[in-house]
């Protein structure tokens, strides 16, 4: 029964054939994998760009797939490309029959596969002798260890050209024997190399240190007395003290330098404490001074207020007596303050007298004018207030009295003097 191949089926076939190539030794096993994946699209899905639906229930056989592949590929040539190496590459043991029976039974295809693996194996990189031979020789001459290697390589190349090749089994044995010999030689050379040629840097540093120590010990022995040597000889019998242990000095024993240092430390501590106390006392003193100043200012302000209140509350008679006392005090102070200024005071006194006389004349004129107005006014227009005012005058009123010319109210107001100035005077 011929199977109808759709585009989707061909795409799926090429997809699995690229993964499992049906050529070479394992072509039948690969074909088995391809058939399984073609018949189970649900289990092994393939992403497609086409939207065509697949018909389920289609079954492919290996013959159908071989026929389809043979239409587009030459399967025989593909097998030859996979099996490029001919039967000449087989081992001599298998040709001559020298090997065991197992080698004779091995299939030729398996031997070809083994040969392919050996050829594909990576080899160590080496520079071509024709182009880089001179550089290799120069480097070999410079390095002392490599002088022996390169002539050996050249000798081996000459021997290889003359001597026939041996079997790989014998080569492996020879290599193993050489490695063992080299290992034994290196082990023997190691102690000689380290002891004779190269000394470690630590040993080199220790040599001058040892010489210096020996010189110091000799000097110490010369200066040592006989008694000290005897003490050392007796101490040898006692138990030896380990180097790691250090004898601790008792606390009571103190050297002179240590005592001086302790005294200096105590002095410094005492000075620091004194400075701290002084710093604490200084702000207290300044604070007390500020408080005293504020108290003095408050007392002066209270004195001035009391004087001002007493001056306003006093009666006429008492005020005049107080004023006279104040005038006397002010006069006493002004006499001291105004020495050499008598002329100015006299001129001011004359001006004050003139002003008072002018005021008196003006008052008299005003009184005469009022009296004349009252007389000329008719009785109807006169009122109780106007009549009383018209009848009364400065001269006839019993309560009002003329003030003295030298009274304090007629004189200009005296300037106040603070208590500080009084105390100073």
Curated annotation (Swiss-Prot):
Residues 143-425 are annotated as: Disordered. Residues 386-396 have a biased composition (Low complexity). Residues 408-418 have a biased composition (Polar residues). The modification Phosphoserine is found at residues 200, 225. Residues 209-310 form a coiled coil. Residues 149-163, 172-197, 204-231, 270-309, 333-346, 354-380 have a biased composition (Basic and acidic residues). It holds the Pfam family Eaf7. GO terms for biological process: DNA repair; DNA replication-dependent chromatin assembly; DNA-templated transcription; nucleosome disassembly; positive regulation of transcription elongation by RNA polymerase II; regulation of transcription by RNA polymerase II. It is found in: Nucleus. Residues 255-269, 320-332 have a biased composition (Acidic residues). One of its GO terms (cellular component) is nucleus. Keywords: Chromatin regulator, Coiled coil, DNA damage, DNA repair, Nucleus, Phosphoprotein, Transcription, Transcription regulation. Belongs to the EAF7 family. Component of the NuA4 histone acetyltransferase complex which is involved in transcriptional activation of selected genes principally by acetylation of nucleosomal histone H4 and H2A. The NuA4 complex is also involved in DNA repair. Present with 300 molecules/cell in log phase SD medium. Component of the NuA4 histone acetyltransferase complex composed of at least ACT1, ARP4, YAF9, VID21, SWC4, EAF3, EAF5, EAF6, EAF7, EPL1, ESA1, TRA1 and YNG2. This is Chromatin modification-related protein EAF7. The lineage of its organism: Eukaryota, Fungi, Dikarya, Ascomycota, Saccharomycotina. The gene is EAF7.
